[in-house]
């Protein structure tokens, strides 16, 4: 037992003291101990105790049965809730996810034995110090992710621990130790038994960590082959073009590192070039081109995010950003207005961040020029918005009702005419006048070309 001291929240200390005075053992446990020893601010303070759930409820006035069948009761101190879980031994696991039964125990060591990694298997009590039976402190000092006990047994109990190993490695910048790595490659196929929602959560935690480039490690260990096979397809795909010196995987990893740790933005950079293997072509001078790869990548993003059960808002934003990330436009007001019309004002600033990160992962020789141009585009964007310039159908001086009154029937033609009017105003803001727009609409309604959209160009 290490006689190190830790600062714990006052309310957590109240719970430890209350259980102790009632005759029970109680410790803060797991991630909060790990983070405190690393000098990080813990997000949650979990408590483990020798008291059974009904005994915990008898000690405290306000409790919630959050997972009582697994021994967990939430103790409310004011408006703050703390999960208090009885020492337990998990029974046999039948599906790499859930134990058949949970058996309570009076021994803290038995509870710590069932935890995933040594750095998460430490407990602390102000009176007793730190309980570190598996050298978690040593592994923190060595910067090692190591399973408690036999790694294969830990992964058999819950296969998601395979992804958690990479996640903690990415969050902390730690190495995974040899036997744990070997067990991962041996047991990785068991991830097929894990729900899409749980896979999604761990994937996002890796991506928004300090080291999103550890996706390379996930691929090396065979994890992506099971949960994200689309990633494996970009490994080793060359990009012989003046804009690139890295293969698609290396470019992708660098692009993720170049953007803020935001879920939508990191997911966008992860998948922005997933379509490149499908469209790669070698032209006469030996250059490799990837025509319309953003559209193909967007289709992959849609499929992947549905498979992993992402929420609709996140999925829609990511797919749109992936689709438009390669849009070609210049710094003129007309070009920026057209880009705003295509991309959407709601995600345009994220779109600029995506293009910035993409550029910074290209050939260093082209980066300064491309960043300078992007800065000009961003400057123009702010001017267009500040001046209230028109770039959407909603900003037109006329609406659908005006066109119906002018004799255009509701239906596809009406929508096509409105789109063409919007394009006309994007090209020339002086056209945003009711009389001029009605005059143009009269010409457009009989023009077969009204249904032909303006072509967009992609990098």
State where each predicted segment sits.
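Catalytic cores of the polymerase beta-like nucleotidyltransferase superfamily
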Residues: 1-459
């Amino acid at each position: 037992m290490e006689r190190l001291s830790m600062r714990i929240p006052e309310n957590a200390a109240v719970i430890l003291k209350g259980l102790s005075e009632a005759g029970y053992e109680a410790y803060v446990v797991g991630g909060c101990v790990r983070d405190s020893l690393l000098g990080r601010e813990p997000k949650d303070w979990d408590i483990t105790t020798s008291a059974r759930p009904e005994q915990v409820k008898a000690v405290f006035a306000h409790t919630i049965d959050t997972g009582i069948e697994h021994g967990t009761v939430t103790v409310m101190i004011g408006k703050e809730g703390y999960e208090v879980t009885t020492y337990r031994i998990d029974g046999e696991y039948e599906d790499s996810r859930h134990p058949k039964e949970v058996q309570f125990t009076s021994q803290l060591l038995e509870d710590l034995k069932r935890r995933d990694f040594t750095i998460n298997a430490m407990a602390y009590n102000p009176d007793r110090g730190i309980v570190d039976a598996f050298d978690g402190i040593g592994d923190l000092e060595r910067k090692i992710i190591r399973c408690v006990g036999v790694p294969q047994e830990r992964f058999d109990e819950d296969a998601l621990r395979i992804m958690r190993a990479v996640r903690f490695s990415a969050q902390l910048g730690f190495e995974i130790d040899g036997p744990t790595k070997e067990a991962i490659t041996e047991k990785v196929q068991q991830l097929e038994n894990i729900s899409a929602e749980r896979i999604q959560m761990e994937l996002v935690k890796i991506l928004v960590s300090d080291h999103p480039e550890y996706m390379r490690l996930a691929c090396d260990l065979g994890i992506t082959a099971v949960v994200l096979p689309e990633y494996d397809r970009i490994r080793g795909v060359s990009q012989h073009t003046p804009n690139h010196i890295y293969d698609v995987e290396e470019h992708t990893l660098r692009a993720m590192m170049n953007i803020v740790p935001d879920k939508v933005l990191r997911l966008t950079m992860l998948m922005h070039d997933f379509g490149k293997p499908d469209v790669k072509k070698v032209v006469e001078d030996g250059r490799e081109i990837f025509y319309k790869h953003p559209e193909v990548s967007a289709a992959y993003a849609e499929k992947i995010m549905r498979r992993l059960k992402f929420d609709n808002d996140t999925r829609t934003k990511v797919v749109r950003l992936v689709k438009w990330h390669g849009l070609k436009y210049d710094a003129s007001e007309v070009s920026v207005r057209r880009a705003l019309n295509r991309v959407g004002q709601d995600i345009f600033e994220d779109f600029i961040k995506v293009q910035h990160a993409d550029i910074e992962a290209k050939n260093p020789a082209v980066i300064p020029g491309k960043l300078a141009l992007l800065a000009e585009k961003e400057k123009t964007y702010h001017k267009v918005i500040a001046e209230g310039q028109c770039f959407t159908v909603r900003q037109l001086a006329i609406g659908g009702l005006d066109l119906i009154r002018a004799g255009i029937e509701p239906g596809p033609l009406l929508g096509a005419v409105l789109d063409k009017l919007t394009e006309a105003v994007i090209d020339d803001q002086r056209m945003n006048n009711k009389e001029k727009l009605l005059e143009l609409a009269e010409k457009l309604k009989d023009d077969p070309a009204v249904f032909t959209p303006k072509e967009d160009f992609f990098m």
